[in-house]
Regions:
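Acidic catalytic/metal-coordinating carboxylates
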Residues: 28-31, 54-58
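Hydrophobic/aromatic residues positioned on beta-strands within the core alpha/beta folds
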Residues: 74-76
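Conserved phosphotransfer cores of two-component systems
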Residues: 37-39, 61-69, 92
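Alpha4 helix (beta4-alpha4-beta5 surface) of REC/receiver domains from two-component response regulators
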Residues: 57, 78-98, 105, 109
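Active-site residues of response regulator receiver
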Residues: 47
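Conserved acidic segment of CheY-like receiver
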Residues: 1-7, 12-16, 44
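Receiver (REC) domain active-site loop signature in two-component systems and cognate sites
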Residues: 50
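Short hydrophobic/Thr-rich beta-strand motif most characteristic of the beta2 strand and flanking loop
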Residues: 20-27, 35
Length: 121
């Protein structure tokens, strides 16, 4: 998970770990890409607006790597152009997009749909 909002990262981590998922987290796109290259993840949850490297740059970089993780892009906070950047994220290869704020159950539903058999055990 890559998001510069530590409170949100914590809430998402708690929900995902409670559902049985292992969670890696980074506060910016640069650190997140490094973590993905070192640890790898089946699914990457990425915020669009982050310091260092934004979510669109991260998605471009992840699409160039092997193996390609499943990507869920998120954005919110009432930012101008939020829908447009999520559409851009989808065009770049994000499998799904989420508008913040969202309920943990919404995120879990998306993850289960995307990972299918690779879901948490």
């Amino acid at each position: 998970m890559m998001d510069d909002d530590g409170t949100l990262r914590g809430a998402i981590r708690v929900a995902l770990e409670a559902a049985g998922y292992e969670v890696l987290e980074a506060a910016d796109g640069h650190a997140g890409l490094r973590l993905q290259r070192e640890q790898g993840a089946d699914l990457v949850l990425v915020d669009i607006f982050m310091p260092e490297r934004d979510g669109l740059e991260v998605i471009r970089a992840l699409r160039a790597e092997q193996p390609k993780p499943t990507i869920v892009a998120m954005s919110g906070g009432g930012r101008t152009g939020q829908i447009e950047v999520l559409e851009a994220a989808a065009a770049l290869g994000a499998s799904r997009t989420l508008v913040k704020p969202f309920e943990p159950r919404q995120l879990l539903k998306v993850i289960r749909e995307l990972l299918g058999e690779r879901a948490a055990s």
